[in-house]
């Protein structure tokens, strides 16, 4: 889909990839943008810079998405491209992640995409065209050591995007799924050292570079967006020989524990001092 003169929604717009997307869309002369984030301090500044319309919403709350879609319809006359970009980190293992945390991670990293599609799709179908760009992660294709909630929800996000593309791709609805490794965003920069080391194994990309690749992929209707080319190679290994892949990840875990002894509880999913011995 050509992005020029299109009406765009971007969630998670205040920082990182979302902020960069808004700037690249503006350079591409979109007609209008609604910029969605809970952080309205940064979002208002960004909206002034790029000429977007700021909007505050909790993307994991379905009522907020319903209201967002209605707002976009009133302000822009419709939605051509919905960048469902918001996400949260969800570090922690099975034993250290509470049910409350699981629900929060699930709502933002999975249900936000589902709510967006559920409520924007009918409008797009009536228009005869539309596009969803869902931000997942390489963790959704591979896994994220020490982060059960993040791995599970990002895998679900990839799966939903794939289903959406298969089901609606021949009805004028484009879908892309963004799966980067490390990107220089506040989420990565504020993470513990071990997390930063994990996601930057193949290098940290700048958000602007990722955003430019996203726009290019939207314009050629490419489903899977992997800004780190190594991810595709890892996927081939994983699919061709899952046992080899798992053994490799187990070996990487041991190496990381040697390099970061304090990270052992997270990487081994340990919950008590006795288990640390």
Annotate each language-model stretch with its function.
Residues 26, 30-45:
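Conserved glycine-rich Rossmann-like NAD(P)H-binding loop of the short-chain dehydrogenase/reductase
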Residues 14-15:
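Conserved glycine-rich cofactor-binding loop
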């Amino acid at each position: 889909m050509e992005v020029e003169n299109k009406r765009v929604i971007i969630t998670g717009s205040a920082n990182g990839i979302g902020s960069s997307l808004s700037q690249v869309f503006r350079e591409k002369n979109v007609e209008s943008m609604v910029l969605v984030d809970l952080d309205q301090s940064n979002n208002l500044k960004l909206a002034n810079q790029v000429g977007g319309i700021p909007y505050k919403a909790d993307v994991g709350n379905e009522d907020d998405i319903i209201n967002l879609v209605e707002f976009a319809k009133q302000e822009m006359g419709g939605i051509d491209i919905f960048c469902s970009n918001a996400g949260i980190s969800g570090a922690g293992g099975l034993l250290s992640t509470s049910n409350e945390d699981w629900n929060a991670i699930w709502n933002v990293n999975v249900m936000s995409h589902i709510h967006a599609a559920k409520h924007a799709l009918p409008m797009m179908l009536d228009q005869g065209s539309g596009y969803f760009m869902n931000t997942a992660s390489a963790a959704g294709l591979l896994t994220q050591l020490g982060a059960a909630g993040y791995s599970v929800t990002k895998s679900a996000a990839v799966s939903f995007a794939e289903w959406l593309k298969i089901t609606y791709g021949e009805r004028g609805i484009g879908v892309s799924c963004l799966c980067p490794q490390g990107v220089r965003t506040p989420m990565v920069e504020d993470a513990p050292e071990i997390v930063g080391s994990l996601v930057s194994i193949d290098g940290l990309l700048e958000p602007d570079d990722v955003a430019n690749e996203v726009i290019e992929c939207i314009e050629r209707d490419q489903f899977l967006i992997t800004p780190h080319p190594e991810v595709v190679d890892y996927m081939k290994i994983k699919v061709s020989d899952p046992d080899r892949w798992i053994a490799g990840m187990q070996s990487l875990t041991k190496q990381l524990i040697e390099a970061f002894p304090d990270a052992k509880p997270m990487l081994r999913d340990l919950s008590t001092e006795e288990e640390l011995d």
